[in-house]
Structure formats: C-alpha cells, structure tokens
Curated annotation (Swiss-Prot):
<feature type="glycosylation site" description="N-linked (GlcNAc...) asparagine">
    <location>
        <position position="448"/>
    </location>
</feature>
<dbReference type="Pfam" id="PF00067">
    <property type="entry name" value="p450"/>
</dbReference>
<dbReference type="GO" id="GO:0005506">
    <property type="term" value="F:iron ion binding"/>
</dbReference>
<keyword id="KW-0325">Glycoprotein</keyword>
<dbReference type="GO" id="GO:0016705">
    <property type="term" value="F:oxidoreductase activity, acting on paired donors, with incorporation or reduction of molecular oxygen"/>
</dbReference>
<feature type="glycosylation site" description="N-linked (GlcNAc...) asparagine">
    <location>
        <position position="189"/>
    </location>
</feature>
<feature type="binding site" description="axial binding residue">
    <location>
        <position position="460"/>
    </location>
    <ligand>
        <name>heme</name>
    </ligand>
</feature>
<protein>
    <recommendedName>
        <fullName>Cytochrome P450 monooxygenase aba2</fullName>
        <ecNumber>1.-.-.-</ecNumber>
    </recommendedName>
</protein>
<dbReference type="InterPro" id="IPR017972">
    <property type="entry name" value="Cyt_P450_CS"/>
</dbReference>
<keyword id="KW-0843">Virulence</keyword>
<keyword id="KW-0560">Oxidoreductase</keyword>
<dbReference type="GO" id="GO:0016020">
    <property type="term" value="C:membrane"/>
</dbReference>
<dbReference type="InterPro" id="IPR036396">
    <property type="entry name" value="Cyt_P450_sf"/>
</dbReference>
<dbReference type="InterPro" id="IPR001128">
    <property type="entry name" value="Cyt_P450"/>
</dbReference>
<dbReference type="InterPro" id="IPR050121">
    <property type="entry name" value="Cytochrome_P450_monoxygenase"/>
</dbReference>
<feature type="glycosylation site" description="N-linked (GlcNAc...) asparagine">
    <location>
        <position position="464"/>
    </location>
</feature>
<keyword id="KW-1133">Transmembrane helix</keyword>
Length: 527
C-alpha cells in the first residue's frame, strides 16, 4: 500500500538529527529575511511609485500613515512632509499626497476620459453599510450618482428658502439664551453654544425634532455620541490601513484596540437616527419643510431612495452638518477677535446694512461681501475637513497635477498642507480676508487650492445650506453683540490653544477637528 504524504513526512523528520533541524531553521530564517529585504528594495527602488519622493519608512510600510491617523496628527504630519519633499509625496507604499491646486480637479473632479475616481475602501464614515446598502458618502460611483440626484432637490435654493424659517427659529433661540448669560457677567464657552445650535438646527432639518441642546444649555448623550463618531471612524480607518478591509485581522484589531464605548457612540447615533427617521417617514403628511418632507414630495427622490438609504443619509447628514459647522464658526470667531481691523470692518458692514434683525434673511446675507470673505478665509485656515480624502486611480492610470500616476494607486490632496503652502498662497498662515476680494497683493494666490467642501461629483451636497447657516448665525451674532476673547486666567490659557502659530499646531484631527473650548465675553450692542 502506498504511504500517504503525512506518513512520508513523519518518516523523513524522524531521520533528521538535531543538526539537520537546526540547519533547516536557519535556512528558513535566511529565506524569510532575504524575501523581506527583496520586498523592501523593490518598494524603494522598483515600485511604480519609486520615482516619487518620501520618507523611506513610508515607502515600505503603512505604519506611519496609520499611526498619524490614530493619533489625530495626519494633517500636521503631511504638512511637514510636503514642506520637506515638495508638492507630491509618497506617503505610503501605494499612496501619493498632493498639494497643487490642479490636483483637486484631477482627483475629485469629473474625468474627461474614463471613470471618475472611486473612494478608497479604507475610508469609513459616520455610519457603516446596512443590509448591503450604503448612504451617499460611501456609495460606489453609480449608486452615488443615483442618490445625489435624488437628494439634490432637498438642497435646492427653493428648498432652502422654505427651510429658512426653521433655521431662523434656532438662531432666535441662540440669541435669546446668550442675552440671558450676559446678565450673569461671566465668560461664555462659544465652542459649546455653536455646537448646541448646529445640532438643534440639523435635528430639526433631518427629523423635525431638535436635539434640545439650546433649551437645556448643554449637550445631550446623542449629540456627544455624534461628535465622538468621527474619532471612532478615524481609529477604524487607521486599522484598515495596516490590516486590510473586512479581513479577520481588521475585525480582531477593532475588537482589541478600539474601546467598547466607541462602538457605543456609533450605536447610539445610528439607533436614534433610525428611530426618528422612521417616525418622520410615518408622519409623511406633516407640513414641516425639513429634508424628509422634500424627499417625500419629490417623486424622483421618493422612488429612487430605499427606506434604508433614507435612514443612512439622515445619519450622515446629522454628523456631517453639525460638528463640522460648529468647528468652523468657532475658528472664525477666534480669527476675527484676534484681528481688530477685520472685526471693525466686519461689524461696520453688518450693522450698517440692517436696520433690524428681521432684515437678516436668506436673500440679504448674500450681499455681505466682507462677511463672505472672512468665512472663506476661515474655511481656508480652519477647514472642517482637514484630513486627506483618499481616492483610487482608475485602471490605466491618470495624470494628476502634471504627473502620470499608475492605475490602482491611492491618491489624495492634503488640505491642511495645501493651504499652508507658500506655493499656493502669499503669507499662507495669516488671516487676511482681502485675498478673497481681489486685493492685488494676492494676485498670485491659487484660491482653488482651498476646497473645504471638496468638489466634483462627491463635493459636499449641502454647501449652500452650510453657507446660509454660517452667514445667518454670524450676522445675527455681530448685529446683537460685541464679542471679545477672554485673555486672562484659565480660560485665557485655553483660548491660546486656537493659536495656529502656537499651541494650535498641535490641535488634533479625527476626520474633523477635535476642537477645544473657546471662552468669550459678550456685550449687547446698544440701540
């Protein structure tokens, strides 16, 4: 009878003496070492991206890229890399980072030839796929196009005009609450109040149910969970870089490395959003001009989106439209308060334009050019989306900012590095709104290098809503109040964390900013 392979192996091993086993182990170790060295040498010298500059460790490993995401330092780390290596940097074995203004359109824009770039699978947003379906953020190109077309009506100018009353009601409440605090003559944490406002506003726009933050003057469990969802997503993305997507290793590392409370953040956010979305859908005849009202009233939107997709998109809109806007408004406040000449010109424009608060509307706030310039400059220096948004180059390759990049390469623009580069802006670290008003000193500025809402088919669908929200809140605040930063004591030290030339350099990013508190004093403008 023929011996099995197992029997032969056992007999062969029995014939080996200890010396032979030692030799075998040495041989295996040498072969593994040679293979690793060969792989390292190939990645450094022979890989299709070998011509692009970058640190040697980044060229051979995903570990540096993973680590800076997990620790919230990707934006500052990539800025240093671009300052050292130039406008294109190899930040991982198969990944390039760009800062040129043309790279935005080349990567994120509509492609003239071939398919648009797909979003990288390592990206994870505020909500994971459900029952095989995804929201607009994570959807592949074809499904994304269908969902975006269906949701476009929700964010049209016609819809925004109808939603104005909802947004104004929450700004009314913010102003009223701030007037109450003035009587107490104590510092106010503007960072929190902006968060309360954006959460209540988006809750009302998504589900016809505000979070209740403004009423109670504090964050709810749900609003806190939404803020932390970004951190959980960044940690998962960090793991995906080294462990792959949907692999056993990724699942194991998520279980071992991400705290259980982080999973609970996502759970609370999803469950609450799902419950409120279903309740709003069941009340379909309600004449409340929120997002779901417009979805149900528009035949194409209603027929194009499944119930699950509506739920997933409401989860996304709550997370994408709250803390991001609150962060920008807080940064904007810091910038105008630390630039007296900007503050005076801005308050003169707003207070000289309106005779009463009722005059501050969707139509009138569009006619405040200096306000728009200050917001654009704040969006440049303190973009709510400072992290790289990776895309995959289609098969066949593509030219990005003048460089041919092979297919299946991961690419992205580094937003924070781009806006801080002297290749794109004169005095890039300085807050100068005039650069957005045609000031000849900045004629060579590449304003397109600042894309806080991204661009192209996956650009922020809520850009117009966001701008109206920001203009409305800022106009109402400066029409009613004089704002000044607290500069002494513990609160003064906290405010220094916003200095982008100082401690602010160490502010962390988990997809969006992990913003610190900001303490201000308010005085009501006498009239």
């Amino acid at each position: 009878m023929l011996l099995s392979i197992k029997d032969l192996s056992e007999k062969y091993i029995m014939l080996l003496d200890v010396k032979d086993l030692s030799t075998l182990k040495t041989t295996v170790a040498v072969l593994v070492t040679v293979a690793l060295i060969a792989q390292v040498l190939w990645k450094i010298f022979f890989h299709p991206l070998s011509a692009f500059p970058g640190p040697w460790f980044n060229r051979i490993s995903e570990i540096p890229g993973s680590w800076v995401i997990a620790t919230g330092k990707q934006h500052s780390y990539y800025r240093k890399l671009h300052e050292k290596y130039g406008p294109v940097v190899r930040v991982a074995p198969n990944e390039l980072s760009f800062i040129g203004d043309r790279a935005w359109d080349d990567i994120y824009g509509v492609q003239k030839k071939g398919p648009n770039f797909e979003k990288s699978p390592i990206f994870i947003g505020a909500v994971s796929p459900l029952d095989g379906q995804t929201g607009i953020s994570l959807a592949p190109n074809e499904a994304h196009t269908r969902q975006r077309r269906a949701l476009a009506h929700v964010f049209s100018n016609t819809a925004l005009l109808q939603q104005e009353e909802i947004m104004r009601s929450h700004v009314d409440k913010l102003v009223g609450q701030l007037k109450k605090t003035i009587a107490e003559n104590r510092p106010i944490n503007f960072s929190n109040w902006y968060t309360y406002t954006t959460f209540d506003m988006m809750g009302d726009l998504c589900f016809a149910e505000p979070f209740g933050c403004l009423d109670q003057g504090g964050a709810t469990e749900w609003s806190t969970s939404v803020i932390n969802v970004f951190k959980s997503a960044a940690w998962d993305q960090s793991i995906r870089r080294v462990a792959g997507v949907n692999t056993w290793l990724q699942k194991l590392m998520v279980k071992l490395l991400i705290p259980s409370k982080a999973a609970n953040w996502r759970k609370v956010h999803f469950q609450n959003s799902r419950e409120k979305t279903l309740r709003r859908l069941a009340d379909g005849n309600r004449e409340h001009k929120d997002f779901i009202y417009h979805i149900l009233k528009n035949k194409e939107a209603k027929n194009s989106l499944s119930e699950t997709e509506i739920i997933l998109n409401m989860v996304l809109l709550i997370s994408a439209g709250t803390e991001t806007t609150a962060s920008l408004l807080t940064g904007w406040t810091y910038f105008i308060c630390t630039h007296p000449e900007v503050y005076k010109r801005l308050t003169d424009e707003i207070r000289g334009r309106f005779n009463s608060e009722q005059d501050i509307t969707w139509e009138t706030v569009k006619d405040l050019p200096y306000l728009h310039a200050t917001l654009s400059e704040a969006l440049r220096l303190y973009s709510p989306a400072p992290a790289n948004q990776q895309r995959i180059v289609p098969p066949g390759g593509s030219v990005i900012d003048g460089h041919f990049v092979p297919g299946k390469t991961t690419v992205a623009v580094a937003p924070w590095a781009a806006i801080n580069s002297s290749l794109n802006f004169k005095d890039p670290q300085k807050f100068i709104p005039e650069r957005w008003l045609g000031d000849e000193r900045f004629v060579n500025d590449k304003l397109n290098a600042s894309q806080p809402f991204s661009l192209g088919p996956r650009g922020c669908i809520g850009k117009n809503l966001s701008f109206f929200e920001m203009r409305l809140i800022t106009s109402r605040l400066l029409w009613n109040f004089d704002v000044s930063l607290v500069t002494t004591g513990e609160h003064g030290e906290t405010n220094k964390l916003w200095d982008m030339d100082g401690a602010g350099k160490y502010m962390k990013v988990y997809q969006t900013w992990n913003k610190p508190d900001m303490w201000v004093m308010l005085k009501e403008v006498p009239r």
